[in-house]
Amino acid sequence: MTENQTAHVRALILDATPLITQSYTHYQNYAQSFYTTPTVFQEIKDAQARKNLEIWQSLGTLKLVHPSENSIAKVSTFAKLTGDYSVLSANDLHILALTYELEIKLNNGDWRLRKKPGDALDASKADVGTDGKQKLTEDNKKEEDSESVPKKKNKRRGGKKQKAKREAREAREAENANLELESKAEEHVEEAGSKEQICNDENIKESSDLNEVFEDADDDGDWITPENLTEAIIKDSGEDTTGSLGVEASEEDRHVALNRPENQVALATGDFAVQNVALQMNLNLMNFMSGLKIKRIRNYMLRCHACFKIFPLPKDGKPKHFCASCGGQGTLLRCAVSVDSRTGNVTPHLKSNFQWNNRGNRYSVASPLSKNSQKRYGKKGHVHSKPQENVILREDQKEYEKVIKQEEWTRRHNEKILNNWIGGGSADNYISPFAITGLKQHNVRIGKGRYVNSSKRRS
């Protein structure tokens, strides 16, 4: 296979979403070689996508590589630090590990990557590519040649008068140099202040623009047709079919030389958790719709109002009732966030007029030994044979584990009944004319409820 000179990167790693939504002709000018893992390749079951994979296989352009155990362990450790490990599947970890492995192989080490979230990168190393290395070697050779030539000694002649004049001249030059340094320092401070003010204004404007985007976001979509059915299923599973939500990419990255270290390996995926880990590791992300480098991604995460920790949204769609860090109940709120590829920082975008609802915090939970409890249960106290009202306040309570297990059983039971009623999704989408019977309802109640301090109306 001849190398593509118009490619953006040398190696492009493709996840399941790019392979399902686009064909080889869409990616052929994006990279010189394409990679994926065997598990992702076997995961694709869609008929049209399998036809596209047959084209990839016939051309021999898609390489199936399984990452090493060391790479998987490194990526898993980093994902645990970012908080995304709980929502990453084995295929997601393998894709990230393969990208990490190729990055180390093509750039001779992991000097471009972060060891842990928030680490500062060495800009001097990042800016030096292969051309820069050649220039450095040439400069070193010139310095060695200049050092090999012996320098002539300057012999000066003169007595005490010449020495006094020379010392006076050196004193004047030193004084002038000090004055120049002070003036330059004042100018530098003024310039730094003005630049800082400009940066603050730009950041304020940028954050306000982002907040406007999040507040004005609309969830309405198009009609689901047989043509976009696969994309609709992928969207429902929590992945992004447009490359990234709110991508901000740069057009100038198209024309950068392929020998630069930052243009060796890129990852194309629609999964936000994978994108989040990749950006915080400083791995390159490519928008598989436009072929441009993703600078920042925007999505939603869960933020605890008590401890301010941020967690990814569960992929299975199940609600999280307790904070994994502080154990707070009802404190997890959905929050818009953006991830920057340059710094790896996750920035939450909060509402400026947000007010926390303090309803239910006036009184503490009643004690089992209180007079009201004695009136309700009698002097015997807690009796297991009578109906109880056990308040769920912590995740490790046996009552919580019991209701979660019951809710999971109810969900599977209802799905089974619905599949039988619809007809299993046949070709003509046959629906039974009989009414649905046998559906069960089950709700998990956490805490005392919204109106815990309100007095109940007696009938």
From Swiss-Prot:
Residues 120-205, 366-385 are annotated as: Disordered. Zn(2+) binds at C304, C307, C323, C326. Keywords: Cytoplasm, Endoplasmic reticulum, Hydrolase, Metal-binding, Nuclease, Nucleus, Ribosome biogenesis, Zinc. One of its GO terms (biological process) is maturation of SSU-rRNA. Changing L279R: Temperature-sensitive. Residues 151-164, 373-385 have a biased composition (Basic residues). Its EC number is 3.1.-.-. One of its GO terms (molecular function) is small ribosomal subunit rRNA binding. One of its GO terms (cellular component) is preribosome, small subunit precursor. CDD domains: PIN_Nob1-like (cd09876). Changing Q280G: Temperature-sensitive. Residues 10-115 form the PINc domain. Residues 120-150, 165-194 have a biased composition (Basic and acidic residues). It comes from the Eukaryota. It is found in: Cytoplasm; Nucleus, Nucleolus; Endoplasmic reticulum. Component of the small ribosomal subunit, ribosomal RNA processing complex (SSU RRP complex). Interacts with PNO1. Present with 4490 molecules/cell in log phase SD medium. Required for the synthesis of 40S ribosome subunits. Has a role in processing 20S pre-rRNA into the mature 18S rRNA, where it is required for cleavage at the 3' end of the mature 18S rRNA (D-site). Accompanies the 20S pre-rRNA from the nucleus to the cytoplasm. In association with NIN1, may promote the recruitment of the proteasome to the ribosomal subunits stalled in maturation. Belongs to the NOB1 family. This is 20S-pre-rRNA D-site endonuclease NOB1. It comes from Saccharomyces cerevisiae (strain ATCC 204508 / S288c) (Baker's yeast). The gene is NOB1.
